[in-house]
Amino acid sequence: RMKKIFAIGDIHGCYDRLKTLMGKIPIDYSRDTLVFIGDYIDRGPHPFEVVDYLIKLKNRFPDVIFLKGNHEDMLDKFLNGADRYTYLLNGGQQTLDSYLIKPVQADQSEFFPIPPEHMEFFKSLRLFYETEEFIFVHAGLRPRVPLESQNTEDLLWIRNKFVSSKYDFGKRVIFGHTPLKKPLVEPNKIGI
């Protein structure tokens, strides 16, 4: 049988839904590829459990691909003392609650107790993943800019300029980030 590629986007702390979805995917880890497109945390009720589950999956199946999303980017900035209010306004409080079990003030600078293996996971996330036919990325690509010249901010955050573009990127782009009622399937891209 042909090798398959499965892509999962924007879990946002929904651990139960992730487990249900993983139980339905007919994946053969020895042949197929599984790509997670970022945004594992924030908004949903169980970000800690989601990250824990993904780390265990990565330990069992090292070939699974994990991309960085804009929410992991916001967490990184939050932990480094930048853009704290932005993070809290974008669903970050759920992640903080999940790790801390107490509310956090945006101006608090005391150590945030993320387990080392979770920090390692966040640091290991890739910005994109490329195959012969596809480019997987969290948010999208800026039209008319070669992949190697793409700006990190665009890979994690771009929306309308990419989603509305008919530009041929040379390969079909598989992306998450932009909320869609159903998958967007176009010749140059698939939004999930």
Name the predicted role of every residue range:
Residues E132-F134, A139-L141, H177-T178:
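Short, well-ordered beta-to-alpha junction loops that form the rim of enzyme active sites
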Residues M2-F6, Y129-I135, E186-P187:
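Beta-strand-turn-beta hairpins that frame and shape the catalytic cleft
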Residues R144-Q150:
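Cytochrome P450 core scaffold surrounding the K-helix E-X-X-R motif
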Residues R43-R126, N160-S164:
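Active-site neighborhood of divalent metal-dependent phosphoester bond hydrolases
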Residues R1-Y53:
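N-terminal active-site segment of His-dependent metallophosphoesterases
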